[in-house]
């Protein structure tokens, strides 16, 4: 099939630089003179009418490029002959004598996705064996036109192009707080299809789909309806993109298993993993996959199965011990494979990180199951690929744009990861690549910045053997994404990526939000002042101010994707506030309001008020940007962090105005535990404390952080439970700390609190409890964990004095005073639960090393 644009005119203008993404495999400039469209130019094609969208898209694109009219279209039934005597193949052979045309003509990727484009004399001719190939040829034609200064000219070229990897795609995390709107997902699909991406995975659909039988799953989180997915799937299909769910079938179920009604299906309450010894899970999975199959009509289905860390720890332990964990996994994978196949899916994908460890799994997996190998380092060689290849399993490699838990993607690192992993995958026979984006810790970063790394992967995935010229790539990307060739765009990207590359913020990218949301006046120590690094922040602020101005100007003139310019400006504003915050925090470490004159006091107050205004403006803009690309579900969680920060500044203003003494903003309760003798096993610890009450109570609240599953009782009354564990998933993070109203359970005289804490992570089972009992007299009695609490392995004792890691921010990071009146728990760091999780994973002999590391983290204020 073909598309021909005729009646072009040869100009006297000379060739301009051609910028294409992905770069074609075979490209030759055959004449320096540019061609231009004339009033008589038209389109002739034998495309099936069902694929007329391809021509419609081209017509819309040339309108954006400045064409005043649509080109007339004539559909014909037979191939149109080129005006010159040479055939298409003859022209190609003449210009690319090194190409083996027999191999080329029978290349499966060429047949399914390849195209030939010739612009010569008075015609542009695109030929392909498939509609998808024609579509890709049109995308290249659009870029050829966009590469010229007027957007209406085209270089005279011969292009032979087809992908070396059949599958080139992305996985988009919509499950961890920032659920993209359908319109935003369509934007991503349309944009990425222009760069010849053909797979789009939605992560994770087991808890982001509105299952009819389980209406509580995904509720309040932006879960997608059948109608939304059906609409999105049809849109993707039209753009030659496969829309595929990543549906976890064993691990990453903690968002669901956090709910009490689903505990029976997991290893334990809040478990990461399903109980594979319970046959009822297969009924649930079968029903859910059936629902998905009604709208996800691709032949591909991704069953996840990565990071299933809890398998064999709880409910399935006896079963797993009996048959061996490798065989247990294999039986489960085969059951899932059979279920998925029964719903019409032909190609099933599974993550590699668990299965590759067990030879019986590698030997026993169905040989058509595709293994997705993911790795986010920058190494050039990946021996595990060779190991998987030995068992003749198809492989897809999956690098990352490395945007998780940071303000701005780590471009330098991700470009190496994408280039090296895809190249090594190609060398080991991979059939494709899927580049991932992750929204760890509530997905605070605006999703629009994912697009650049995704586009980079399209370049590498098309031809992994070709070395990417980064300057030319970014020049091409910015031109085709924003529609103009303006060096200021390049400057914005270069300056923002240099913030990380040159360590201008003096912190690791993954610690940025920890410092951003930490209490600005957290400590009163000279060492703390020393640890707040602000060197050359004045220069960085100046750079960010410059970027903000540039972005404001660019927003007015870019013809496409203006919203992405606004996001880049927001990043600059965010960094600027971060710098101002740290400068102010450092300045006020030694500040004593009682010793300064009124004039200086006013200066300090004005500085804090300026920070408040800056932060408030930042929050307002953040909300606008969020709602322009994502559903409102999930935003309140992050907004609350900004509001806490504003409250901290309000309190500092009040403290300064009143010339009050500095007050430690962290709750005084300590992180306590019994001992470290039960590491690497599930164990239970009981904690108890007796409190005396001699007056009438106005209100009484208890805030509890468990480790990992804590039941709270007061005077033998069950109050509730809290699941506190390390997770990247939204529901767990939202509920790691719980507040309980305990007034009705208290009595005059002695009251006994008992915490039954079960640590399923193999850690040391630490807890932190802070409570306030307000008495009618106006007095407040505090409940706080410390070394006056007792602990035991059994409910009946023997009871021992507990051990303590001290009060926040030690180990947990900062924990400010909760707002009990409004049921808002302490603002916690993303790192709060990491320590106990690490204890459960590292060898027991290294426990003391971890304790030293945590002490150093505290000493150097890495955790605030």
Give names to the regions the model predicted:
Residues 660-678, 746, 752-829:
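An acidic-aromatic loop/edge-strand motif
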Residues 711-769:
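Beta-strand-rich ligand-recognition modules
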Residues 1-132, 140, 144-163, 350-356, ...:
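Acidic, contiguous N-terminal accessory segments
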Residues 51-52, 178-180, 207-211, 250-254, ...:
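Flexible loop/turn segments at secondary-structure boundaries
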């Amino acid at each position: 099939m073909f598309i021909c644009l005729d009646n072009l005119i040869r100009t006297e203008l000379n060739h301009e630089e051609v910028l294409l993404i992905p770069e074609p495999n075979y490209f030759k400039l055959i004449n320096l003179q540019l061609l231009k469209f004339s009033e008589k130019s038209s389109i002739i094609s034998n495309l099936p009418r069902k694929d007329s969208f391809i021509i419609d898209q081209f017509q819309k694109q040339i309108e954006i490029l400045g064409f005043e009219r649509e080109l007339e279209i004539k559909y014909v039934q037979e191939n149109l002959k080129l005006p010159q005597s040479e055939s298409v193949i003859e022209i190609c052979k003449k210009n690319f004598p090194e190409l083996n045309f027999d191999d080329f003509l029978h290349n499966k990727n060429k047949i399914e996705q390849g195209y030939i484009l010739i612009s010569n004399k008075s015609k542009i001719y695109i030929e392909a064996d498939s509609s998808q190939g024609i579509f890709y040829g049109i995308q290249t034609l659009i870029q050829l036109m966009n590469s010229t200064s007027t957007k209406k000219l085209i270089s005279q070229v011969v292009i032979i192009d087809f992908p070396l990897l059949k599958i080139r795609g992305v996985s988009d995390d919509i499950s961890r707080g920032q659920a993209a709107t359908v319109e935003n997902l369509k934007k991503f699909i349309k944009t990425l299809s222009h760069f010849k991406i053909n797979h789009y995975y939605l992560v994770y659909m087991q808890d982001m789909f509105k299952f009819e039988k389980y209406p509580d799953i995904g509720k309040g989180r932006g879960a997608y309806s059948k109608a939304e997915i059906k609409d999105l799937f049809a849109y993707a299909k039209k753009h030659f993109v496969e829309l595929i769910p990543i549906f976890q079938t064993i691990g990453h179920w903690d968002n669901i298993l956090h709910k009490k009604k689903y505990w029976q299906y997991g290893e334990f309450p809040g478990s990461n993993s399903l109980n594979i010894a319970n046959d009822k899970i297969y009924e649930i999975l079968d029903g859910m996959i059936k629902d998905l199959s009604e709208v996800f009509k691709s032949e591909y289905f991704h069953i996840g199965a990565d990071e299933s860390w809890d398998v064999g720890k709880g409910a399935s332990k006896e079963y797993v011990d009996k048959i061996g964990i490798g065989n247990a996994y294999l039986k489960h994978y085969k059951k899932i494979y059979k279920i998925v196949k029964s719903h019409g899916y032909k190609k099933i994908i599974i993550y590699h990180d668990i299965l590759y460890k067990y030879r019986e799994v590698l030997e026993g997996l169905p040989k058509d199951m595709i293994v997705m190998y993911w790795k986010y380092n920058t190494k050039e060689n990946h021996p595990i690929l060779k190991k998987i290849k030995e068992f003749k399993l198809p492989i897809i490699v999956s690098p990352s744009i490395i945007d998780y838990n940071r303000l701005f993607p780590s471009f330098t690192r991700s470009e190496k990861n994408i280039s090296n992993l895809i190249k090594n995958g190609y060398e080991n026979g991979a059939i494709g690549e899927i580049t991932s984006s992750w929204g760890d810790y509530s997905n605070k970063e605006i999703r629009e910045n994912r697009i650049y790394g995704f586009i980079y992967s399209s370049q590498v995935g098309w031809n992994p053997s070709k070395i990417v010229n980064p300057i030319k790539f970014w020049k091409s990307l910015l031109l085709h994404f924003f529609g103009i060739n303006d060096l200021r765009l390049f400057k914005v990207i270069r300056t923002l990526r240099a913030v990380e590359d040159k360590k201008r913020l003096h912190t690791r990218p993954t610690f940025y939000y920890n410092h951003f949301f930490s209490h600005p006046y957290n400590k009163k120590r000279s060492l703390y002042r020393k640890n707040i690094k602000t060197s050359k922040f004045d220069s960085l602020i100046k750079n960010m101010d410059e970027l903000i101005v540039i972005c404001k100007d660019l927003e007015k003139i870019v013809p496409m994707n203006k919203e992405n310019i606004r996001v880049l400006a927001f990043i600059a504003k965010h960094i600027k506030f971060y710098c101002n915050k740290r400068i102010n925090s450092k300045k006020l470490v030694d500040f004593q309001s009682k010793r300064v004159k009124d004039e200086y006091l006013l200066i300090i107050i004005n500085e804090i008020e300026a920070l408040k205004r800056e932060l408030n403006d930042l929050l307002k803009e953040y909300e606008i940007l969020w709602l322009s690309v994502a559903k409102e579900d999930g935003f309140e969680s992050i907004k609350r962090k900004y509001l806490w920060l504003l409250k901290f500044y309000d309190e500092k203003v009040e403290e300064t105005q009143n010339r009050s003494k500095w007050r430690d903003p962290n709750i005084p309760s300590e992180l306590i535990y019994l001992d470290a003798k039960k590491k690497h096993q599930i164990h239970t610890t009981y904690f108890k404390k007796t409190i005396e009450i001699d007056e009438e109570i106005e209100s009484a609240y208890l805030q509890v952080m468990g480790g990992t599953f804590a039941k709270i009782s007061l005077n033998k009354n069950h109050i509730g439970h809290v699941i506190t564990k390390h997770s990247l998933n939204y529901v767990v993070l939202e509920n790691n700390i719980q507040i309980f109203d305990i007034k009705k359970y208290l009595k005059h005289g002695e009251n006994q609190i008992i915490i039954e804490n079960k640590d399923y992570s193999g850690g040391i089972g630490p807890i932190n409890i802070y409570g306030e009992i307000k008495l009618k007299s106006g007095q407040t009695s505090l409940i706080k964990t410390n070394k006056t609490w007792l602990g035991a392995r059994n409910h009946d004792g023997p009871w021992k004095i507990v051990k303590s890691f001290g009060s926040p921010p030690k180990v947990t990071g900062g924990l400010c005073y909760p707002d009990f009146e409004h049921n808002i728990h302490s603002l916690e760091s993303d790192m709060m639960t990491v320590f106990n999780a690490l204890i459960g994973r590292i060898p027991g002999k290294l426990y003391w090393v971890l304790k030293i590391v945590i002490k150093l983290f505290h000493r150097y204020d890495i955790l605030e």
